[in-house]
Regions:
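Glycine-rich phosphate-binding loop of actin/hexokinase-like ATP-binding domains
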Residues: 63-70, 115-121, 141-143, 281-282, ...
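Gly-rich Lys/Arg/Thr-decorated short loops/hinges at beta-loop-alpha junctions or inter-strand turns
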Residues: 55-64, 132-137, 147-166, 187, ...
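Terminal amphipathic helices with adjacent charged low-complexity linkers/tails
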Residues: 193-239, 623-641, 702, 707-713
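Active-site phosphate-binding/coordination module
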Residues: 113-165, 223-227, 513
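C-terminal, non-catalytic interaction/recognition modules in large multi-subunit enzymes and RNPs
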Residues: 38, 46, 173-177, 181, ...
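Short glycine-rich, Thr/Ser-proximal phosphate-binding strand/loop in the N-terminal lobe
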Residues: 44-74, 144-163, 420, 523-530
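N-terminal glycine/serine-rich phosphate-binding loop of ATP-dependent small-molecule kinases
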Residues: 6, 19, 24-114, 168, ...
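ATP-dependent carbohydrate kinase catalytic cores
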Residues: 75, 79, 84-85, 224-231, ...
Length: 715
């Protein structure tokens, strides 16, 4: 059943059931008072519970952060966050923003009315999908409905064959009748998705022209422009998603930019998109579906940045929040990009996206016993209402947070003392739900909860590393999010990862990622030819045409020519296969031997086999058009003595490999200078996270205030 379409509201960007009770809370750290002439960069990441703000002083490299509750209208939360950071809008040189607005709109199906016009006989392509299921064996599990109900999918007589020959032109009488229906229904957003239009867009363009004649104010998206690729389900669904999100993202971006400029901001509002770049509010109106993975991309970008500052080109990102954990991989300084992703299974969005695996493992994930009597952890979550049992807001089922606070790894206060945790309630829930049914002591039950959570995350890391041909032993683990640093060392031990890195501000690291990106557009075009018979002159001409389109898009976003950069990629596959791999190529291709060599090498790594003697074909070409921004640079601090400052206290903590609790020193991270070394066992607390340093581990603060923990490998 499809939710009824209605007028857009930014209330849809936030699940109001998850609004926190502590509406008055504003969390600040390290106030930054800018003087006249100084400018700052501000990044904002809107989550379901909190809006995180990261502020970088361009002159000193100093960073400070702020948190405010996410509001019903997310724009209010953004402006509240900037205010909480003590930053004036006219001091902001650059503002970038990651948002779940588009993601939530697709999940809830709350967007303005829209229609799809397609080839007669293909009305149900986006509902039939590929015939696969998220859970193959659960035949009773309902699939999510398409973004447009059947009554909102209209058809017209037309046909183009596989080679691009127009067999039947658009029936003009039918087309004008459809225009009459659309006008009568007051629809202003239409997706035109014709079969084989990726190879010849003539009929789609004619249908668009007729609609514009009959309804001058209508907004039309053509599948041949949005995603000119084969496979109609993927192309149709991407175009439909882009159409329904365009007014949502466009209105949001325009209003946010307007309110900020009214307050004195003079620049563009930059919105983070799935590919790891940003687009202006104008660009978001045209390619809104790229915002559907806005939030998770920021964490992956920041993780790579932190790892490279610490001296690691290979890194695995562990972004553990309250409900979920996002995991990504960076090899040789490059994040992995995928074209195969979705917000909900069965409805692909084919814009390039940073490859991030999300699992239901967070601080609020529930521990429970399944029908077979096994201990499970997540994906169910306590959310922010009622939250973990220890929050004393009505929660009854134990969570990872409850286990951590009971074992002493978390203190009794969070968020700078504004949230008090009830350890007794956590213990009772652990005993009732896990301890008694499994015959475990309360401490062993709490340890078991965390071990299952760690096992779930370790399995996810294996999927993004070992499954792709990468050995975790060659990587650093970057642990962040509110809960990542609690589990980082335990996870590294399970996976034999040699080092764990914790950013200076783990809880707002995703917001930092928004400061590290360029304006990017990804253009694709089908180009099917055997490598041996490819016309290189024609191939280069196609690339130049795509680069010119990219140049026009960047110019539309006010990017100067000297700040434009273009990269070319060829998607290759073995003849007869349909899965392909994207291979970078030089600006002017003189031959394809090196590209073919790279293809065989990458195919062997990712799929564990290659066939150097088999014929290879090109199936698609891509251009990434980039408008370069000045990157954020963190302040570099001189290294001081290894001796850390005195701990602020102690408490008994139970660690994984110890048989009893150890009286453990507690450190305030704000007091740890560059060069300081903290010997485990220890717990390091800060405003937005807590770091567990088990016995035998040393936490060292580097010149960028990144904490590095070497993890000895077991024999």
């Amino acid at each position: 059943m499809c939710l009824p379409a209605r007028a857009p509201s930014r209330q849809d960007a936030v699940d109001v059931r998850r609004r926190p009770r502590l509406d008055h809370v504003k969390i600040r750290r390290n106030r930054m008072n800018t003087s006249a002439g100084q400018s700052v960069r501000v990044a904002c990441d809107v989550g379901g519970t909190f809006t995180d703000v990261c502020v970088l002083n361009e002159d000193s490299g100093e960073i400070h952060v702020a948190k405010t509750p996410t509001t019903v209208d997310p724009i209010d939360g953004v402006l509240n966050g900037i205010d909480a950071a003590d930053v004036a809008l006219n001091d902001i040189a650059l503002f970038s923003h990651g948002t779940t607005l588009a993601t939530n709109a697709l999940i809830t199906r709350r967007f303005p009315p829209a229609l799809m016009v397609t080839t007669k006989g293909f009305r149900d392509v986006i509902e039939i999908r590929r015939g696969t299921r998220d859970d193959l064996w659960d035949t009773y599990k309902e699939m999510a409905p398409p973004y447009l109900a059947r009554r909102d999918r209209l058809s017209v007589s037309e046909r183009v064959d596989y080679a691009g020959k127009v067999i039947e032109e658009v029936d003009e009488k039918e087309a004008r009748e459809l225009a009459r229906i659309i006008k009568k229904r007051n629809i202003t957003n239409v997706a035109i998705c014709f079969v084989n239009s990726f190879v010849n867009s003539k009929n789609e363009e004619k249908m668009r022209d007729i609609l514009l004649e009959e309804i001058p104010n209508i907004k039309v998206s053509l599948s041949s422009e949005i995603m000119p690729e084969i496979f109609e389900h993927e192309r149709f669904n991407t175009t439909v998603a882009n159409t329904v999100l365009s007014p949502v993202a466009g209105d949001y971006g325009a209003e946010l930019e307007g309110r900020m400029k009214t307050g004195g901001y003079k620049g563009e509002v930059l919105l983070l998109h799935s590919g790891g770049g940003v687009m202006t509010a104008k660009g978001a109106t045209q390619f809104a579906a790229r915002l559907a993975a806005s939030g998770i991309a920021a964490g992956a970008i920041a993780s790579r940045f932190i790892a490279e500052l610490a001296g690691y080109k290979n890194s695995i990102s562990l972004d553990m929040g309250g409900t979920s954990t996002d995991i990504s991989l960076c090899s040789d300084g490059e994040l992995h990009i995928t074209n195969d992703w979705h917000v909900e299974y069965g409805y692909p969005i084919r814009f390039p996206s940073i490859e991030v695996l999300t699992i239901g493992a967070g601080g609020g994930s529930l521990a429970w016993r399944d029908a077979a009597g096994a201990l499970r952890n997540g994906p169910q979550s306590a959310g922010s209402e009622p939250g973990p049992v220890c929050y004393d807001r009505g929660g009854t089922e134990p969570t990872n947070c409850d286990a951590n606070v009971y074992l002493g790894r978390l203190g009794r206060k969070l968020a700078g003392g504004r949230v008090e945790l009830n350890v007794d309630l956590a213990e009772k829930a652990i005993e009732r739900v896990i301890g008694q049914p499994f015959g475990l002591t309360n401490e062993d039950a709490a340890l078991a909860i965390l071990k299952v959570a760690n096992a779930n995350m370790a399995d996810a890391v294996r999927l993004v590393s070992l499954r792709k041909g990468y050995d975790p032993r060659d990587f650093a683990l970057v642990a962040f999010g509110g809960a990542g640093a609690l589990h980082g060392v335990a996870l590294a031990r399970d996976l034999h990862i040699p080092v764990v890195l914790v950013p200076p501000n783990p809880g707002v690291t995703s917001a930092l990622g928004c400061l590290l990106v360029d304006i990017t557009h990804d253009l694709t075009q089908m180009y099917v030819a055997k490598v041996d018979g490819a016309d290189l002159g024609d191939l280069n001409a196609k690339f130049r045409a795509m680069e010119e389109e990219g140049r026009e898009r960047l110019a539309h976003e006010d990017i100067a020519p000297d700040r434009m950069m273009f990269e070319r990629f060829i998607d290759m596959r073995y003849l007869g296969q349909w899965r392909s791999m994207s291979i970078p190529v030089e600006s002017d291709i003189s031959d394809l031997k090196e590209a073919v060599r790279k293809f065989h090498q990458e195919h062997g790594r990712e799929h564990n086999y290659s066939r150097p003697d088999a014929p290879v074909e090109i199936c698609r070409i891509q251009v990434r058009a980039t408008g370069l921004n000045r990157k954020a640079e963190l302040a570099k601090h001189p290294l001081g003595p290894k001796e850390p400052p005195a701990p602020i206290g102690t408490r008994p903590v139970r660690f994984d490999e110890e048989e009893q609790r150890i009286e453990t020193p507690i450190y305030d991270r704000a007091s740890l200078h560059a060069g300081a070394q903290v010997q485990g066992p220890a717990v390091i607390e800060q405003l937005d996270s807590t770091i567990v340093v088990p016995p035998g581990i040393t936490a060292e603060v580097d010149q960028y205030l990144i904490i590095k923990m070497q993890v000895p490998q077991r024999s």
